[in-house]
Each structure stands twice: as C-alpha cells, then as structure tokens.
Amino acid sequence: MKANYSAEERFLLLGFSDWPSLQPVLFALVLLCYLLTLTGNSALVLLAVRDPRLHTPMYYFLCHLALVDAGFTTSVVPPLLANLRGPALWLPRSHCTAQLCASLALGSAECVLLAVMALDRAAAVCRPLRYAGLVSPRLCRTLASASWLSGLTNSVAQTALLAERPLCAPRLLDHFICELPALLKLACGGDGDTTENQMFAARVVILLLPFAVILASYGAVARAVCCMRFSGGRRRAVGTCGSHLTAVCLFYGSAIYTYLQPAQRYNQARGKFVSLFYTVVTPALNPLIYTLRNKKVKGAARRLLRSLGRGQAGQ
C-alpha cells in the first residue's frame, strides 16, 4: 500500500522523449546555454560590484536581473539535462512543487524587475537633470526588494491555489518541467472554475501590469528622444533602451503565450518548445544583449583584466 501511495505522488515528465534523435542536439544546446548563462551573468555581477564606474541604478538592477536569470535557469536545467540523457523522468511531487515554486517566483520577479528597469531608463532619458535625486540608492533597494517580494508572493499564491485543485491520474506531463499550465491540464473538472479564474487573474496581473508599465515608460522615452537636439544623446538613448526592449520582447513574448491562455487550450507539445526558449535561451542571451554594445561594461572588463594581469606579473 505504501508503494502504491508513493507511486501516485510522482509525476512522469516525458520531456522530449518523442524526439529521440533530437535529444543529443538539445542536450548540447541546453548545456551550452546554461554555461553561457552562469558565466555571463556571474561576470556581469562581478564587474558591477568591483568597478565604481558601474555603481549606478542601471547596473544595480542589471545585477539583480543577472541573479534572477541564473537562479531561474538553475531551477530548470539540471532535471532537463537528466531527462535528455535518459528515459522519461519520474519526479516526486515534493520536487515538482519545489521546482514550480522556484520557477514561478524567479520568473515573476523578472517580470517586475524588467518594469523597474524600464522606469529607470525613462527617468534617465526624460529627467536627466533630476535623475540622481529621483533614483536614489534607497529607492533602488526598495524597488529591487519589491521585485523579489512580488515574485515570491505570486509563487506562493499560485502554488496554494493549485493545491486546492485535485489532480487526475495518470500524472503524465508532456513537458520537461513542472510548469503551471501543464499541471493545470491534469486538474479534474468540477468545482475548479473559480480557483482557475483566480489563478488566471493573478497571472494577468503579474504579466500584463508590468508590461503596461514598460510600454508606457518606453513611450515616454520615444517622445523624449524625438525632442532631443543632439544626435549623440539620441544614439545613446536609443542604444540603451533598444537593448532593454529586445530583452523584454524575448521574455514577454514567450511568457505571455505560455501563461495567458486557458488551460483547456494549452498545447503541451508546442508549449514545451516555447518554455525552452524563455527558460533556457533568453537568460543566456540577456548578458550579451545588455553588454555587447555597452562601452562602460567593456571598459570595466578591460580594467579588470589589466588588474589581474598586473597581479599575476607581480607574483
């Protein structure tokens, strides 16, 4: 009896077992993206902490984004790699719940953090003379803390609401992670409409409210850029905000597709490829998007390498 109970408390994650010839390729790509994510985001945090020239609100928020991305990917990639190397993965319910909580918390925190970064850029471009007074270190800490707290709150709320829904057998997930839309597909019918509507409303708030803030912020930036007289300032503003918009489009496009559709319409086979993009690919691209054309970050990297070289020569 105990064995039967423990079997019922596990989820079978099929991952990409329907495409066996694709699994070795995906394994290599996912591992490469994961290494790029850890390396790129760690380097970004190191540079921002060590170089006084990067002690500004923009890089403070970028550090938090780097930490979110590294944690978000780490909550997903290890079981995904295990799944790609072998047969379908059996995951205990406790592990599944922990993964769901972590990915929801970090993904939600990223939604809010991207909105905070958009507000920061709008303040820098639209109010350059008052920027230092508006965006104080205390405000930066408050906004960053609010991003993490919002993510944690949404994660706890969504997980608690999901726990109210009884899940029907077989507990088979055509996915590589315990993602909310895939788990909702297993929920039994009946009295769950109210709970599901509450969960959907929470997802709308955590996704669309920050997205609206982002659109409004970059609308204000666009108006300010059009009024600029100097082409140099216009190019800097467009370059900085353009990189932010690229990251926003990559993340929000796939996240909105995944989370803002009814559970009945959710296609697991298509959904796992979309999820692969925003959980693995986007975190690997973010350090490149934000730093590839950033002269301050490149300068900080050169200074760090020179200091390390002098240290080695001194020994």
Swiss-Prot record:
Phylogenetic placement of the source organism: Eukaryota, Metazoa, Chordata, Craniata, Vertebrata
GO cellular component annotations of the record: plasma membrane
Gene: OR2I1
Function: Odorant receptor.
PANTHER family: OLFACTORY RECEPTOR
Protein name (database record): Putative olfactory receptor 2I1
UniProt GO MF annotations: G protein-coupled receptor activity; olfactory receptor activity
Primary localization class, coarse: membrane
Domain of life: Eukaryota
UniProt subcellular location: Cell membrane
InterPro entries: GPCR_Rhodpsn, GPCR_Rhodpsn_7TM, Olfact_rcpt
Disulfide bond annotation, renumbered to this chain: 96-188
GO biological process: detection of chemical stimulus involved in sensory perception of smell
Keywords, alphabetical: Cell membrane, Disulfide bond, G-protein coupled receptor, Membrane, Olfaction, Receptor, Sensory transduction, Transducer, Transmembrane, Transmembrane helix
Family: Belongs to the G-protein coupled receptor 1 family.
Stretches of the chain found on the membrane's Cytoplasmic side: 49-56, 120-138, 220-236, 293-315
Topological type in the membrane: Multi-pass membrane protein
Chain ranges passing through the membrane: 25-48, 57-78, 100-119, 139-157, 196-219, 237-259, 273-292
Regions of this protein lying in the Extracellular compartment: 1-24, 79-99, 158-195, 260-272
